[in-house]
């Protein structure tokens, strides 16, 4: 638990580098007489990543566990530049977890790495997420969603449009998938204003994860290390939301949660 506490505190304070964290802790030897080394900290942080996610889920459920409306989106996580992609050694021992080349339609850029899929409630609390290869289509994550969620509505962007997947979600789990129409669709309709406002919530989450938690910055040299960093950042994000709830503050104002 001490490792998790130290990890969550450093992420919440915006300390993104483990080496930098331990350079700071050297000045507090009296407060941390039994402080482990940076290498031991990294190893134990990887070992406790599943426990960290379990605690995060309980906090998320305690904030708005009865949510019936969700937003879904994805975020590119680049591990190196495209030119160095073929020389990247991350995941070389396990191809199923190795990064791949992908394309981000919103940014109109090619990249090499992973894709972070996120499902959050209308209040901004992240309930589910996963990290896949960059080449995996957004729709594939919905196959995992239907195994966990049911009797709810999910708002997605145009990347989730598909009559077959919408019908499958509705018939298998009574999930209603709402997506804006493409301009060239025959049955085109203007986007509903409440739907557009709901979509802004997950975009705000991504902005906060990139700004305060620097989720797109990668120092990891292996796949497990990257996954552990992602889990730690999203867990710290949820903890700050939980702190705001306990203090009767808007849960989205995470920058002021530690004040």
Where are the regions a protein language model picked out?
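Short alpha-helical elements
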Residues: 1-259
